[in-house]
Each structure stands twice: as C-alpha cells, then as structure tokens.
C-alpha cells in the first residue's frame, strides 16, 4: 500500500507527524510519501519549496525507513493539481485533512479526481465528514473511495496557527531548530 500525504506543510507540524505515524502504525505494509505543494500553487505566504522539502525530510527521518518525501510537485513547471500528481502515484491512497476535503468540488479535475482515486480523510475537531459525503451525489456514489479516520485522536494544531502565534510546541523540536537556523516565518 502506498500512502501519499499532500499539503503545503508550511511548516510541517506535530499534527502532520502524528497523522503520518498513525497511518504507518495502522497500515503495517504501507509506505508513506509526503508530497509538498509547489509555490506555483496560488497560496499566500508559502516559504520556499526547498525549505519545506528539507523540513519534511526531517519529519520523514524521524518516522523511519517507510516514510519519504517527494519533489514531484515541486519540480513541475506549473501547478497542475492533485489529480495530475495522483496519475503519477497511481493506485495510492491520498491523505487530506477534512478542511481540504470540504472544498474538494473546487479542485482541478473534479469529479474525475474522486472517481479515479482513493482517499484517507483526517477529520478535525468539529468536522462531520460523513455528512459532507452524504450531501454530495458524486461523493456518495463513490463512498468506497474514502477511508475516514474517525478513530484518529483529533489534534487541534495547524501550520497556520504556528505562523500566527509562533507557538513552539506546535512543531517537532528538529523542525523548530531548522526554522530558527534559517530565520523562517
């Protein structure tokens, strides 16, 4: 089983680490690849591709040999969307937070994105992923393409919270050290 964990990781937090660790423990035969979004994606305040990649390398090493990081999206000449990336990682399970899942209809190549791929959804506090699925005809029809991690202990940490507050306990010590060394955020 191949698990691809995509996102901005701006920066990678303890929540990202704990989700990846949980998935590797739950799926003993799985390998996990972090797939950071390129700065070519129209998202404000992303630090450089290289810095986010290096921070994910730190997280991957801490997780062990079944975790790695891909430059696939970072090295594309233009942002083409998750659908295009999942064509490259054919047959994988794509991990996303419920905050992103709530807007999946707006993603490039929806509904084919949902029809042709499998997803692992990580709920956040207050999210009702099942209600979201049942409220949408395509999501309901392809319900079997979604694994919802309802048994995962929800963590109320986010990269945006770190960027806003600079609260150091949101990050792994090694990531925090990297951020301080390079004067990021």
Model-derived features: where do they sit?
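Nucleotidyltransferase catalytic core that binds NTPs
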Residues: 1-185
């Amino acid at each position: 089983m191949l698990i691809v964990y995509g996102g901005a990781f701006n920066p990678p937090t303890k929540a990202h680490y704990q989700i990846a660790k949980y998935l590797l423990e739950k799926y003993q035969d799985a390998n996990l690849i972090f797939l950071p979004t390129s700065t070519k994606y129209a998202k404000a305040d992303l630090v450089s591709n290289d810095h986010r990649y290096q921070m994910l390398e730190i997280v991957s090493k801490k997780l062990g040999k079944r975790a790695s990081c891909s430059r696939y999206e970072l090295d594309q000449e233009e942002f083409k969307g998750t659908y295009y990336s999942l064509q490259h990682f054919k047959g994988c399970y794509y991990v996303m937070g419920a905050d992103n899942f709530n807007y999946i209809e707006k993603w490039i190549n929806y509904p084919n994105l949902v029809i042709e791929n499998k997803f692992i959804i990580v709920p956040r506090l207050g999210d009702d992923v099942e209600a979201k699925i049942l409220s949408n005809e395509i999501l309901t029809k392809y319900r079997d393409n979604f694994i919802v991690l309802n048994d995962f202990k929800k963590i109320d940490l986010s990269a945006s919270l770190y960027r806003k507050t600079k609260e150091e306990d949101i990050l792994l010590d090694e990531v925090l050290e990297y951020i301080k060394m390079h004067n990021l955020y």
